């Protein structure tokens, strides 16, 4: 009778350990998915240290040049202030750009869609940053 209780107790402990292991694995998987959420298609994420990124600089200059052609404007590229990316069919870049309009510095927001494997780049939007908005 006593052996039966010990065997039952050991079996119960093994079941509890197995359940704890499964629960821990699921929790770790959920955390891993949450950690990678910014990498999923559709999520917009900040790009750090973008002032020195040559690709982003080139995209910002492209945005200003495209706007100048479409709007018959003469804005001069000054610097890239901020950048974000979103994975779509390619990459959508959300750029905050400082330009010079004559002698006045202004901030603009640009959206540039790029699909490098197709040699495709398109300015989707170019608009002034609203007064009081943070860059």
Swiss-Prot record:
Alphabetical UniProt keywords: Protease inhibitor, Signal, Thiol protease inhibitor
Site (Reactive site): 42
Motif Secondary area of contact boundaries: 86-90
InterPro entries: Cystatin, Cystatin_dom, Cystatin_sf, Prot_inh_cystat_CS
Family annotation (CDD domains): CY
GO molecular function, one term: cysteine-type endopeptidase inhibitor activity
Signal peptide: 1-24
UniProt similarity note: Belongs to the cystatin family. Phytocystatin subfamily.
Designated name of the protein: Cystatin-1
Native species: Zea mays (Maize)
UniProt gene name: RAMDAZC7
């Amino acid at each position: 009778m006593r052996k039966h209780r010990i065997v039952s107790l050991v079996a119960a402990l093994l079941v509890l350990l197995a359940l704890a292991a499964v629960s821990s694995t699921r929790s770790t998987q959920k955390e891993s998915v949450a950690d990678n959420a910014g990498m999923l298609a559709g999520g917009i994420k900040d790009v750090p240290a973008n002032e020195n990124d040559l690709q982003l600089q080139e995209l910002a200059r492209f945005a200003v040049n495209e706007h100048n052609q479409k709007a018959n404007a003469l804005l001069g590229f000054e610097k890239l202030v901020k950048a974000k990316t979103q994975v779509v069919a390619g990459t959508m870049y959300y750029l905050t750009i400082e330009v010079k309009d004559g002698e006045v510095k202004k901030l603009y927001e640009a959206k540039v869609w790029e699909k490098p494997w197709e040699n495709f780049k398109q300015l989707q939007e170019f608009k002034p940053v609203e007064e009081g908005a943070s860059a």
